[in-house]
């Protein structure tokens, strides 16, 4: 009669457990390796626009000015799908006043109601509250509302600016001071397509975006449909940016556009 060692089953379990632990450690190491220092991430170059939506997004691309107490925008993801690990929420804006490889602005377009929404979103490696950094990762966005995306004489009818992860302030009365000043043939020309925004931190609230009289800077624009599959997958992963909400992800985009939709006065 064949006998079975009382330890044979245990040995089999231990072997499986060891293999499982090894696989888990490998998986964790891969996940950790996927998040890298902000200065390692290479932003996407701005491609030549080919579609109506892409051309409109370039036409209306805004300037962003950052105050001296917050971070400048960084690239959040590279072509391989690696994401930034952000920076710890401490020591003011140390380590995030200059993006070594250049900054990035992300765009996505959606028709909504009788208007077209162009969302521009920026990533920041620290989140600020009451003037102090409190945690890793922050996203801020604006939605520029266009009356007719396909028309050569299309115009901005409103702009909605993020005041939190999901809420927007909407402005329908824009004046010349809200638009960029561009130098053309030794003359300063006021744009009628490029708005000026400031990433601002003041008072008893989180940092937010507002219209400003400062010119700021342009960033390379990459549209959602121009990203690599790996980059889109990374931006769609809620685990990659802590509690910060990626406003143009597949999960969030439509809800943000709906929230930002302006009042009846401009519909």
UniProtKB/Swiss-Prot annotation:
Q: Which InterPro entries match?
A: NPP1
Q: Where is this motif: Conserved undecapeptide motif?
A: 117-127
Q: Where is this motif: Conserved heptapeptide motif?
A: 134-140
Name of the coding gene:
NLP6
Query: In the UniProt record, which residues carry a glycan?
Result: 114, 192
Q: What does this protein do?
A: Probable secreted effector that may act as a pathogen-associated molecular pattern (PAMP) recognized by the plant immune system.
What's the chief localization of this chain? secreted
**In which compartments does the protein localize?**
Secreted
Gene source species: Plasmopara viticola
What's the record's remark on domains? The structure of NLP effectors is remarkably conserved with a high level of conservation of a central region containing the conserved undecapeptide motif AIMYAWYFPKD and heptapeptide motif GHRHDWE.
- Sorted UniProt keywords: Glycoprotein, Secreted, Signal, Virulence
Protein name, UniProt field: NLP effector protein 6
> Which cellular components does GO assign to this protein?
extracellular region
Pfam family, any one: NPP1
Indicate the family of this protein. Belongs to the Necrosis inducing protein (NPP1) family.
Could you say which residues form the signal peptide?
1-35
